[in-house]
Amino acid sequence: MTKNFRFEKDSMGQIKVPSEALWGAQTQRSIINFSIGEELIPIELIYSLTVIKRAAAISNFKLGLINNVKKDLIIEACTEILDGKHDSQFPLKIWQTGSGTQTNMNINEVISNIAALKTNSGLGSHHPIHPNDDVNKSQSTNDTFPAAIQISVVTQIIKKLVPSIKELTKVLDSKSNKWKDLIKIGRTHFQDAVPISLGQEVSAWSKQLKDAEDALIISLNELCFLPLGGTAVGTGINCPKDFSKESIKSISEYTGLFFYKSKNHFSLMASHDRLAQVMGQIKILASALFKISNDIKILSSGPRSGIYELIIPKNEPGSSIMPGKVNPTQCEALSMVCTQVMGFEYAVSIANASGTLQMNEYKPLIGFNILTSIKLLNHAISNFRLKLVEGIQPNPKTIKANLENSLMLVTALVPKIGYEKAAEIANLAFNESINLKEATIKLGYLTANEFEDAINTNKMI
């Protein structure tokens, strides 16, 4: 037994810890007490907490609270974690304490034990770096964990999600420009409407995504104000003056992003309105993508019995029973991701509303849902672009046939003959299965030349 385990001690006594594990007693207790699901704390959140620990060590050294040796050992340990060398040492689930305390201690213990290995002091010795007294100095989970969520969300959106959106809109803009002169029938209420160019139709998708991106970036502004330094309840107990300012400066330098000290720590620890707001903008992005994917599904329906104005890439067989079938699978995958994100947003809203007094006790759930949404959308958008949008092509023959066969071209006659006569033409054409020109001449409202001059689709867009 002693071969596979070592004994570590915390304020509750001794506990067995796997002999090679870099975590300690409090992490092990969490593993035992919260055997729920498989959803781990996102590694991006672990890294952001590690950035905070690194910044805290620098600040504590500058303020004379730890010596140079301890500072360097903590920084070295943080560097190894941020390089991805110890990802397996963070095994905790999101289903734990609502403050994230066990994850904060998980990081504190791992940093302590990395330092112990470097100095041949033995795992679990808490020497020369103590997880609480050194790594966690001047901090509380209650200010570091929400700050880490904010840092990781801002970082992942700016460095991962926004570039994916930009790449997709770039491709859509290219398609829009290429198809600007390809006139097709527009549709409202799933019924024929007046003409529009395919380029104009695609431009709507691009603009919708650009607007969602802009709103998302704007929502990050308030998220850059961190509650670091508020410690337990926002008052800053046990946190020296200038610690927050110095730490946030180090965080900004390390991440290359601008973060600032919050003017009111209490609000950012008791509630997470700003995170909920960002999640709301992520949901709006998801709703835009959902709409675009549905449009493409409709326009590519067929190939013989649907609209079939767009031809999607043939990526894989679509059916196990129907040979030759090609399905809009990328649209379906993206739609499912968007559906999940919308559900996550609802959970974040409830979680944000459910905090009590000086603490919101749903932090791991909020962090997980937002970061998972960012990751899912990032991957789904890239896949959607590469496997569908870049290869999508128009079907000019079907587009032309649908346009010429539409009764709604009669709208162009309204300025010449009025609404009622135009409606009469459309009804006659439909009832007798003739075209608009034939119906117009039959009713004697216009000559053939007058009709041709009025029904010029190039003038309708």
From Swiss-Prot:
It is an enzyme of class 4 (lyase). Pathway: Carbohydrate metabolism; tricarboxylic acid cycle; (S)-malate from fumarate: step 1/1. The record marks E332 as: Important for catalytic activity. It comes from the Bacteria. GO terms for cellular component: cytoplasm. Coiled coil: none annotated. Its EC number is 4.2.1.2. One of its GO terms (molecular function) is fumarate hydratase activity. It is found in: Cytoplasm. The keyword tRNA-binding does not apply. The active site is at H189 (proton donor/acceptor), S319. One of its GO terms (biological process) is malate metabolic process. Substrate binds at residues 99-101, 130-133, 140-142, 188, 320, 325-327. Pfam families: FumaraseC_C, Lyase_1. It catalyses: (S)-malate = fumarate + H2O. CDD domains: Fumarase_classII (cd01362). Keywords: Cytoplasm, Lyase, Tricarboxylic acid cycle. There are 2 substrate-binding sites: the catalytic A site, and the non-catalytic B site that may play a role in the transfer of substrate or product between the active site and the solvent. Alternatively, the B site may bind allosteric effectors. Homotetramer. Involved in the TCA cycle. Catalyzes the stereospecific interconversion of fumarate to L-malate. Belongs to the class-II fumarase/aspartase family. Fumarase subfamily. This is Fumarate hydratase class II. It comes from Prochlorococcus marinus subsp. pastoris (strain CCMP1986 / NIES-2087 / MED4).
